[in-house]
Amino acid sequence: MKSSNPSLTTCIRLNEADFYARFDSPHIVGPQGKPPPLHQVAIERVTICCEITCISDLLRIVDEHPVAENVEYNINMKALHRISEPLRKLDAMIGMESLKEHVVDQIIYFMQDLHVKADATPNTKADAKAENGVFNDYMHTVIYGPPGTGKTEVAQLIGAIFSRMGVLKKTKFKKVTRSDLIAGYLGQTAIKTADVIKECLGGVLFIDEAYALGNADKRDSFSKECIDTLCEALSDHKSNLMVIVAGYEKDLNDCFFNANPGLNSRFTWRYNIDNYTPEQLAKIYEKKVLDCGWTLKDPLRLDWFQNHADYFTCYGRDMETLLARAKIAHSRRIFGSSDDKKRQMTHADLERGLTMFISNDEVKRRKEPGVLTTMYL
């Protein structure tokens, strides 16, 4: 999308003190490696005026406006360039249009330091130990979606973005499930959960299938101990911990958020990953084939994925399993053939791979009427 307001560029002159403070840098040097005389360098002030509606808009700014020591922007261009790599990876993920649109709000909010108290000094902003003396807002995030839709990868990319922006001080990303947080005896669960939280300070704690921590009737004492410990940490470490939870929306609401009334308000940022269409599944399968260095001898048929979509309820995860089975089918078909026949996937390989894929009893049941895809009734 092109901006309705073009970028505005003006040149300014800095006073001598500001000049040498800004340009104590190897990028702009004069004789003997010193900054050039003040009168020789004009500082260009560039104002970026455009509407940001999606990740692509941010990437366009990066592509059109390089970071330079003699250019001053009205936005944090250095931070935007630092996060461009994870932004491109997120933008390149198949589907997820709603998430890609709305995650921009979270990024530009924190990039502008709007989460920081107005009276915070530069030193307290940079101090990872400042804790709640600085931050007004939570980073904690929810990603709704079924298995196999890329929630873990999205969580990793969001964590990388916050780390590169400097909001998080570490690149730490730890994925956990119920067994990593809940112990076998009462009293031990709080300690185990607290230890995991401590390990993740400065980075991201990602709880996959977080609904498994609780239950709808709230009778699990171990779960309550874990969730209460987690809920307290969400506030105590607001400034240096991002917790991301993921799972089915209904299950998370019934079994996780319903377990403690304080949880809901601490997870400000929420995103939905929609179910993949047959066309998107075909694109995911093709990408996985190419990413592993194989080729498609026969073009993929959209109608084939439409006809078998009911088997692929775990979406991207199923495409990975299907490819593994198709590779096995391929190895049998080309046994004894010349090297130029290898790693060229045919439709016959895909068909045989599907036969192997649906031989699993759990996969067979996916086409049966009334089969539930969630863990809880």
How should each PLM-predicted stretch be described?
Residues 1-81, 86, 91, 98, ...:
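N-terminal accessory segments that target, anchor, or regulate ATP-driven/P-loop NTPase machines
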Residues 81-141, 160:
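Pre-Walker A (pre-P-loop) alpha-helix and adjacent loop at the N terminus of AAA/AAA+ ATPase modules
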Residues 97, 310-335:
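The conserved phosphate-sensing helix
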Residues 127, 332-377:
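C-terminal engagement/docking regions of AAA+ P-loop ATPases
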Residues 156, 211-217, 227-282, 291:
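Canonical AAA+ ATPase core
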Residues 165-170, 255-258, 264-265, 270-313, ...:
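Conserved C-terminal "switch" segment of AAA+ ATPases
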Residues 170-200:
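Short glycine-rich substrate-engagement loop in P-loop NTPases that contacts/grips substrate
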